[in-house]
Amino acid sequence: MEWLNVLESHGQALLGPVAWMVVWSLVKIVVIAVPIILCVAYLTYWERKMIGAMHVRLGPTRVGFKGLLQPFADVFKLLTKEVVVPSAANKVLFVVAPVVTLMPALAAWAVVPFGPEVVLANVNAGLLYIMAITSIGVYGVIVAGWASNSKYAFLGALRASAQMVSYELAIGFVLVSVLLVSGSLNMSEIVLGQGRGWFAERGLTFLSWNWLPLLPLFIIYVISAVAETNRHPFDVVEGESEIVAGHMVEYSGMAFALFFLGEYANMILLSCMAAIMFLGGWMSPIDIAPLNWIPGWIWLGIKTFCVVSMFVWFRASFPRYRYDQIMRLGWKIFIPLTGVWLVVLAIWMQTPWNIWR
């Protein structure tokens, strides 16, 4: 990272320390936010292609080679549509709600490590920051349902908020379990902790990652992440046969697109968190020279892509659950299970068989 130090010294000399700090912060935000938005655009393309393949269809093929420009066509379509604000709606809150939904999904990336030293803010409470910032998104959903002054929107917002809060508890217990075995809230240290152990010393790094000893928690985390993002088969929030588009039913144009962007950005974020906490983050699966030459951010991207593809696979494979089944799964199965596993881990770590020493 020598070139970064040179760039920083020249920037401070040219603009002054305060102005350079502001400019450099904006540059880092753009460098992270723009690729995330592009990833969201092409996640929609991959979702349609993957589901099409599972249904023995072609998916989008019209715009660009193999439909590669379809996401840009969708963005252009939404940009040209009128944003209609219902006459009975609270106009200020109606406009603010989509922004409140999207911003936490982008702000959370500030502490996500893409490599050993590639992170916007390497804070010691990174995991706590992620837990706090991602819980704010539910307020955008509640505000959207209330501000729309529509029965369908309000019912959808109630469903969404209850579902998101329920599964946030299960995810929270899983994160506490990872904190327990890692001994740190720092995201980079959580990744580095997975590179130690008997298997890692013999080059089989992928067997030292947390997914193996914490396999039940990994499964619970992935399913809870699907429910947290209101994705199929937990998408009763947008049940077309019941409440149409839920809290988004009165939105159109770019206001609707911001909700859409927030949902897919959360999918990528939670998938990246799964890669960091359970799949070794930026580390290669086997400690050999050809794989170690591949940059860490590529390994993190591959692992995130695999978890995101599981979201799409669930959508194409499973029928929608009833609302009462979703709440029962969260409160009566996942939360008690994660609580029990937390106790089991605490006891395990006090025994001679503690593998995280």
From Swiss-Prot:
Give the top-level enzyme category: translocase
Membrane-spanning ranges: 18-38, 92-112, 127-147, 165-185, 206-226, 268-288, 294-314, 329-349
Pfam families according to UniProt: NADHdh
UniProt GO molecular function? NADH dehydrogenase activity; oxidoreductase activity, acting on NAD(P)H, quinone or similar compound as acceptor; quinone binding
Q: How does it sit in the membrane?
A: Multi-pass membrane protein
Catalytic reactions on record: a quinone + NADH + 5 H(+)(in) = a quinol + NAD(+) + 4 H(+)(out)
EC annotation from Swiss-Prot or TrEMBL: 7.1.1.-
Name where it's found: Cell inner membrane
Entry keyword set: Cell inner membrane, Cell membrane, Membrane, NAD, Quinone, Translocase, Transmembrane, Transmembrane helix, Ubiquinone
Look up keyword Transport and say if it applies.
no
Primary localization: membrane
GO annotations of cellular component type? plasma membrane
> Does this UniProt record's set of keywords contain Translocase?
yes
Q: Which GO terms describe its biological process?
A: aerobic respiration
What is said about its interaction partners and assembly?
NDH-1 is composed of 14 different subunits. Subunits NuoA, H, J, K, L, M, N constitute the membrane sector of the complex.
NCBIfam families attached here?
PRK06076.1-2, PRK06076.1-3
The role this protein plays is: NDH-1 shuttles electrons from NADH, via FMN and iron-sulfur (Fe-S) centers, to quinones in the respiratory chain. The immediate electron acceptor for the enzyme in this species is believed to be ubiquinone. Couples the redox reaction to proton translocation (for every two electrons transferred, four hydrogen ions are translocated across the cytoplasmic membrane), and thus conserves the redox energy in a proton gradient. This subunit may bind ubiquinone.
Q: Which family does it belong to?
A: Belongs to the complex I subunit 1 family.
In Swiss-Prot or TrEMBL terms, this protein is called: NADH-quinone oxidoreductase subunit H
